[in-house]
Amino acid sequence: NVRNPLIILKDLLKAFSMKPAFFAGLFILFSAVNQGVNSAILPVFYTNTLGWDPATYSQISGGPGAFLEFLGAILGGVLADKYGRRRIFFMGWGSFSILSGLFGVSILGYEQVPYWIQLSYLIVYPAFIAIGTVAMFSLAMALSWSKASATMFTSYMAISNLSVVLGTKLIGPLTKYFTTGNIYILMMFFCLLPVFLLKHMNPESIIKLKKNSSN
């Protein structure tokens, strides 16, 4: 039977009324913005400013970068199971924010960014995003409850995608007022700010609620 969309919406709003579910959505919305900024600005910066050949950029990001991203995804799942979803979620995305901020510092600090920094950043940053994203998936599944749990999980994915898109839309205003190095540093601080929400994202209360409702 096809469920009434209004009932699904009601269940979804009820599910997000739980503090851990709401704060997790808020955390995701703010924390993924720099991923959108990075994905939009990095190819242009590497080819136009650092002088990389577009083919070389694609080979590095699609070769070693993609391989480390794959390993990061596996590692993120293992670490989330062992050390906790929230901790690894923030470790992954937070490490990316710090790494991108340090990259911004190097852009400002060097007349020509050393090649090893250019190469290292391009290869390593996708792994940190992957670690955090897998842990985020795990957290989203734990937080998704009520009869609209599938829709709720999809909502978390949509919030993450929306955050990335917002980041790409910010490129115009940001580049108008800030240099590339300053943008990376600004995004680091902006995306680390939601760290105070982590303590409110404990899924245990919702996990217990799901267990009780299934009994």
Where on the chain are the PLM-derived regions?
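Short amphipathic helix-loop junctions that connect adjacent transmembrane helices
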Residues: 40-58
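Helix-to-loop junctions at the C-terminal end of transmembrane segments
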Residues: 71-88, 175-176
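Intracellular juxtamembrane helix-capping segments at the cytosolic ends
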Residues: 130-145
